[in-house]
Amino acid sequence: MKLIVAIVRPERANEVLEALFMAEVRGLTVSRVQGHGGETERVETYRGTTVKMELQDKVRFEIGVSDHFVEPTVRAILDSARTGDVGVGKIFVLPVERVYRIRTGETDQMAVTPGWPEEEPG
């Protein structure tokens, strides 16, 4: 099992969400966050004062998936979030030790994969 964390630009969030649903990825958390990556500095004027904007608005997706869903999930995010510009975002794939579904008490694969136990593809 893995936790996929993707940080994308807010203007690409709807496209990413749609691509994840099309890839049959279910069960995710979306948060508005701020961060700074490889973008150039942005300077704005506010009430006559020049302000250096060091943090950019971003959207964070957190998706717990079984191992066979990692590649389709990452591909959906890459294809929908990529613009070719600097600062588009990052995807992190992290190992997950244990998952519990609070409602049923199911654990691990049964807690993250809809319809489990079905035969895994491939």
Functional labels for PLM-detected ranges:
Residues M1-G122:
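Positively charged, small/polar-rich N-terminal and surface patches that mediate targeting and assembly
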